[in-house]
A protein has these predicted regions:
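Conserved donor-binding/catalytic core segment of Leloir-type glycosyltransferases
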Residues: 5-7, 171-190, 195-201, 209-212
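Glycosyltransferase donor-sugar binding loop
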Residues: 39-43, 183, 208-221
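Donor nucleotide-sugar binding/catalytic pocket of nucleotide-sugar-dependent glycosyltransferases
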Residues: 128-169
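Nucleotide-activated donor-binding/catalytic signature segment of Leloir-type glycosyltransferases, i.e.
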Residues: 221-238
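Aromatic "clamp/platform" in nucleotide-sugar-dependent glycosyltransferases that forms part
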Residues: 257
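Short hydrophobic beta-strand element within catalytic cores of glycosyltransferases
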Residues: 274-277
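Conserved acidic donor-binding segment of nucleotide-sugar-dependent glycosyltransferases
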Residues: 289, 293-300, 309-315
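A charged, aromatic-enriched C-terminal amphipathic alpha-helix characteristic of glycosyltransferases
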Residues: 315-347
Length: 350
């Protein structure tokens, strides 16, 4: 069996979309490859921050990486591509020390939807990305729509859609237009303050917004808890019965400012739950060109408008939309189609 060295974040130590996606991919690959793991851990409190502890961790990972590649013939390095100046330097260091000690291929996974925007951000970002692309063997994007124009058609680029494990077809429930669900970490860029601000202004029926997530810092936690009321519930991370809660919610709201191909939307689709989301990353492509409940990120008026559009939509039409979302998940994002594509990327032919 060939050997894969994985470097990245994994649950249960790290819980977010990327770590969960990593775990799914490693689970599949471990059936056909020997997997060597160097786990990366960045607490949510360090989100979007550079720190001495991060530098120390990178040096520790490089030390472990060098040890693995000198003792084992590694055929593939598999890692996530970070999108920041600091993150790009980390990518380049991992790539450099892997190539220095191994003849294997370096495969990096891009989980974000702003690759091209970062590339065009500055002269420095262009130089960092150009150097990295020159040295890397393969870049995995989440969708053809997220592959930057300047990389389309090159052999180094491919895509792999996300999937949900465990996969199950849930019963479609009547939509009462009452129960709203926010299920993401409490990060400002996830739009948590946007939905809280808008939801407290909505004057319609017996609405309830349940929010689940992990806090990233004390200041933001205080801002979020300010909105707690009889119809807005702020809760900790959801660890049990997640799919049942998604399935029983009337609508899931994801007001993110930036996304790639969010797992929470795939989870809602699998459960047949209506989605209200910002139109960022691959979300329009995931839900379909004519999906009605999308709004412009950071635009609170547009978010409010879409919520009222949902509330005024006929119940039968909502059931039809639930059926459509569930069918779309199983046609485009099933475990089986994901597995075939993943194994092909790593050169495994059954």
């Amino acid at each position: 069996m060939k050997n894969i060295l994985f470097v990245g974040e994994l649950p249960p130590k790290t819980i977010h979309g990327v770590s969960n996606s990593n775990a799914m991919n490693i689970k599949v690959l471990s059936q056909y490859f020997n997997i060597h793991i160097i786990e990366e851990y960045n607490p949510l409190t360090t989100h979007n921050k550079s720190s001495f502890s991060k530098i120390k961790q990178i040096l520790s990972i490089i030390k472990k990486l060098k040890k693995v590649v000198t003792s084992t013939r590694i055929d593939f390095l598999y890692a996530n591509m970070a999108m920041s100046y600091f993150g790009m330097l980390k990518n380049i260091l991992f790539l450099y020390f892997f190539k220095k000690g191994s003849e294997g291929d370096a495969v990096f996974h891009v989980h974000r939807g702003d690759f091209e925007r970062f590339y065009n951000h500055s002269f420095i970002s262009k130089k960092l990305v150009d150097y990295f692309i020159e040295k890397v063997d393969k870049l995995i994007f989440l969708s053809p729509t997220l592959i930057p124009v300047f990389l389309r058609g090159t052999r180094k680029v491919t895509y792999l859609q996300n999937t949900i494990i465990p996969e199950e077809k849930y019963e479609l429930l009547p939509n009462k237009k009452e129960s709203f669900l926010y299920l993401s970490n409490y990060i400002e860029a996830k739009g948590i303050l946007d939905i809280l601000s808008v939801f407290q202004q909505i004057q319609e029926g017996n609405l309830l917004l349940n929010c689940y997530g992990s806090f990233t810092d004390r200041g933001l936690a205080e801002k979020i808890k300010f909105y707690e009321s009889s119809f807005i519930k702020i809760r900790d991370t959801l660890t049990e019965n997640k799919f049942d809660i998604i399935n029983k919610a009337d609508v899931l709201i994801l007001p993110s400012h930036n996304e790639g191909q969010p797992l929470i939307i795939l989870e809602a689709m699998m459960c047949g739950t209506i989605v209200i989301a910002s139109e960022v990353g691959d979300i329009r492509n995931m839900l379909g060109e004519n999906y009605p409940f999308l709004f412009e990120a950071k635009d609170l008026k547009d978010l409010e408008k879409v919520i009222y559009l949902y509330l005024k939509t006929d119940s039968e039409e909502l059931i039809n939309l639930s059926e459509y979302l569930q069918k779309r998940y199983f046609e485009l994002y099933s475990n089986e189609s994901h597995k075939r594509k993943l194994l092909k990327i790593f050169g495994y032919e059954s």
